[in-house]
């Protein structure tokens, strides 16, 4: 359960910048996908989940330095395969080396990455892009056990 929590929800806040970027309030459901491809290291993960009995709420909020990885470090590599299809490969840091955790493909529907397979990092969720710039990617994950 801890691994699932760390792997799945860690992507809530995949951020590659230590700079603050202010954006105008925009309700547009489209994004500029030209910045989506690349390697994105986890900077902050925050969230909560209900335990199996749904009586206890487990919360977490931790930070990582993607430039100095340690045992909690994670990253994803996003590559464009065709016009609207992307591969997402996830990695975790183990010892002194990055280990592949899984690979998925998906398409963009507005700001949502609709995954074709759910056996990788986003096992129970289709991530929603909250922020995307050339140096910052913020994803929101809401688990959906029906996937």
Where are the regions a protein language model picked out?
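N-terminal compositionally biased, intrinsically disordered segments and leader/signal-like regions
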Residues: 4, 34, 40, 56, ...
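Tryptophan-anchored aromatic micro-motifs
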Residues: 32-61
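Short glycine/acidic-enriched loop and turn motifs that connect beta-strands
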Residues: 145-146
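Contiguous, well-ordered beta-strand patches that form the walls/edges
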Residues: 46-51, 68-140
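Bacterial Sec-dependent N-terminal signal peptides
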Residues: 3, 16-43
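Bacterial N-terminal signal peptides that target proteins for export
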Residues: 1-10
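Short consensus segments that form the blades of beta-propeller domains
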Residues: 30-31, 56-68, 95-97
């Amino acid at each position: 359960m801890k691994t699932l929590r760390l792997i799945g929800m860690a992507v809530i806040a995949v951020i590659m910048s230590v700079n603050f970027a202010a954006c105008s309030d925009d309700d547009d459901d489209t994004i500029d996908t030209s910045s989506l491809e690349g390697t994105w290291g986890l900077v902050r993960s925050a969230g909560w989940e209900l335990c199996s009995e749904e009586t206890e709420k487990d919360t977490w909020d931790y930070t990582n330095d993607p430039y100095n990885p340690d045992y909690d470090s994670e990253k994803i590599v996003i590559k464009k395969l065709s016009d609207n299809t992307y591969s997402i490969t996830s990695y975790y840091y183990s010892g002194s080396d990055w280990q592949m955790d899984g690979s998925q493909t998906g398409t963009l529907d507005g700001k949502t990455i609709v995954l074709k397979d759910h056996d990788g990092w986003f096992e129970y969720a289709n991530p929603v892009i909250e922020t995307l710039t050339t140096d910052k990617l913020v994803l929101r994950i809401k688990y959906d056990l029906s996937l």
